[in-house]
Regions:
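Sec-dependent N-terminal signal peptides
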Residues: 4-12
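Core domains of carbohydrate- and sulfate-ester-processing enzymes
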Residues: 136-176, 301-317, 397-441
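Substrate-binding cleft/loops of secretory-pathway carbohydrate-active enzymes
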Residues: 129-139, 262, 268-302, 372-386
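Active-site clefts of carbohydrate-active enzymes
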Residues: 233-241, 323-342
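Acidic/aromatic-lined carbohydrate-recognition and catalytic surfaces
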Residues: 21-205, 209, 222-275, 421
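C-terminal beta-strand-rich structural cap/linker in extracellular carbohydrate-active enzymes
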Residues: 526-542
Length: 542
């Protein structure tokens, strides 16, 4: 194995010419913590129905606290027919019974707060379920008071649903079409109607009064605030979503949302913006709009590339107006271990070091810390995701064989990353005593929390060590970049806060020997970096 001696003198303060803006000690709490995303059906079941619930999740708060998690993002848990696992809300004021009662939620929130853990909830404001009372009233007649809560037209344009097929559904009761940018059972709200805006304000205040610490707003740049008549252009036989997203007026809608949330002190807003283009993301991030956007700079990378990782990191630093979000996995993406780590535990550790030491707000997807992997459906009946089911059915309609359709369904299904949390090697991975709502990965006996807690060389132990370090070091929470560079297959950066500097070297290439500057204190790693190893060291008061 080759060695290459590098002296990182550019990290030394004496050679520094940069004058970074310092962050004061009153920085918002969300800048200093790492979030953990819990996909509601898949974390911990307490009653044997095969679906996670608040009682089960409460029983796992000690685990999250010991891991070093300071924030939790909950995917939707409101009453829903679950066409899209809760992203189709039927009642904004009720807990879905499969997750427990309002008392169960209140206790979960209380116990999380006792452990110093903030909780934000997913809020879907682009559409509701067609089971929602508002929609049921809306479709009764053209002059119903709820009619204009949704978008109804005599003739549809050419817009396509993001789940496949057309975006308009004919309703024979009133002889008009309603808009659904996603599934036909998820009708888009009309944000040009002041009554809708007032309803949303009431919903937000209800949950803020409950003590929720903030919201993650789903597909926030999809809100209908303008034109629904102009056709989308077609390029190379594929529709370009030009006029159905990022409409004029969305910023005003978001400013109303933000002003409502701001009535309550110290609350956090993050929006999912369906784009990986920085110029689109930055339109929605400001003190008057969203605190941060859930940007897909890392999440959109489909194959491992040091060059791409560095370019995205550099792009976020140069172009984002404030803190970016840092994440690799989510309920919409394939698992990190499959997509970028390619089954390599050491690379997964290096990628963890990247998002937990870089500038930004990190989000860890449940199970990522133990290296959970994708699942694949073996039959159509094993597909749970509406998107996967739709693409299967479209393939069959187009004349493809069942096997070809299953391949299409699996390719487009988001089930890959939604399998139950793997707690131990007991039946059903310790997730449930009943039949799980979705298949459990067959590798749970080898990949689980209990096993990795007993192994100091495990991926879980690395995540825990990194989180403890991040929680301790203000520089890793609030520090600005002094240096951000790539050398061969290494990503190197220094973050600075007040008089302190912490340097990070992540080696994705061949073995490297590092000569540290005088007075450097190693926080993690060592100065002989093998492939996929990292080094974190501090320089104080120089």
């Amino acid at each position: 194995m080759s060695k290459f001696l590098i002296t990182f003198l550019f990290f030394c303060v004496m050679n520094s010419t940069a004058k970074p803006v310092q962050v004061n000690t009153t920085s918002p709490w969300w800048k200093g913590i790492a979030f953990y995303q819990i996909y509601m059906p898949s974390f911990q079941d307490s009653d044997g129905n095969g679906i996670s619930d608040f009682k089960g999740m409460t029983s796992r708060l000690d685990y999250l606290q010991s891991l070093g998690i300071k924030g939790i993002w909950l995917t939707p848990f409101l009453t829903s027919p679950k066409v899209d696992n809760g992203y189709d809300v039927a009642d904004y004021y009720q807990i879905d019974p499969v997750y427990g009662s309002m008392d169960d939620f209140n206790r979960f929130l209380e116990e999380a707060h006792k452990r110093g853990i903030k909780v934000i909830m997913d809020m879907v404001l682009n559409h509701t379920s067609t089971d929602c009372k508002w929609f049921k009233e809306s479709r009764k007649s053209r002059d119903n008071p709820y009619r204009d809560y949704y978008i109804w037209k005599d003739q549809p344009n050419n817009w396509e649903s993001f789940f496949g097929g057309g975006a308009w559904k004919y309703d024979s009761i009133t002889n008009q079409y309603y808009l659904h940018k996603f599934d036909v059972r998820m009708a888009d709200l009309n944000w040009t109607n002041p009554a809708v805006v007032n309803e949303i304000k009431k919903v937000l205040r209800f949950w803020l009064d409950k003590g929720i610490d903030g919201f993650r707003f789903d597909v926030i740049n999809f809100l209908h605030t303008d034109d629904v008549t102009t056709d989308n252009p077609i390029k190379a036989g594929k529709q370009q979503h030009l006029y159905d997203i990022n409409q004029h007026g969305i910023q005003k809608a978001i400013s109303i949302i933000k002003s409502t949330v701001s009535e309550y002190p110290d609350r956090f807003t993050v929006g999912e913006v369906g784009s990986d283009q920085i110029e689109v993301l930055t339109q929605y991030q400001s003190p008057q709009l969203l605190d941060v956007v859930f940007n897909f700079n890392f999440g959109s990378i489909q194959a491992f590339s040091v060059e791409r990782l560095f370019n995205e990191l550099q792009s976020m630093e140069k172009n984002m107006p404030s803190y970016p979000t840092l994440f690799f996995g989510s309920h919409d993406n394939p698992r990190l271990m499959n997509r970028l780590a390619n089954g390599n535990i050491q690379r997964a550790k290096a990628l963890a070091a990247l998002i937990l030491t870089a500038k930004g707000v990190p989000f860890i997807y449940y199970g990522e810390e133990i290296g959970m992997q994708n699942i694949t459906a073996n039959t159509f009946d094993e597909i749970e995701d509406i998107q996967g089911k739709t693409f299967y059915q479209l393939a069959r309609t187009a004349g493809k064989s069942p096997d070809e359709a299953l391949a299409d369904g699996n390719k487009n299904s988001r089930d890959k990353s939604r399998s139950p949390m793997q707690w131990d090697d007991s039946s059903n991975a310790g997730f449930t005593t009943g039949k799980p709502w979705i298949k459990i990965n067959d590798n749970y006996r080898d990949i689980n929390v209990r096993k990795e807690l007993q192994d100091k060389s495990s991926l879980l132990y690395t995540y825990k060590s990194l989180l403890i370090l991040r929680n301790k070091e203000k520089t890793l929470q609030y520090g600005s970049y002094e240096k951000l560079e790539k050398k061969n297959d290494m990503i190197l950066f220094t973050r600075t806060f007040k008089k302190e500097k912490i340097s990070i070297i992540i080696n994705f290439g061949n073995e490297q020997s590092v000569r540290l500057p005088e007075g450097a204190k190693i926080l993690m790693g060592n100065n002989l970096l093998r492939p996929n190893e990292f080094l974190i060291y501090k320089i104080v008061g120089r």
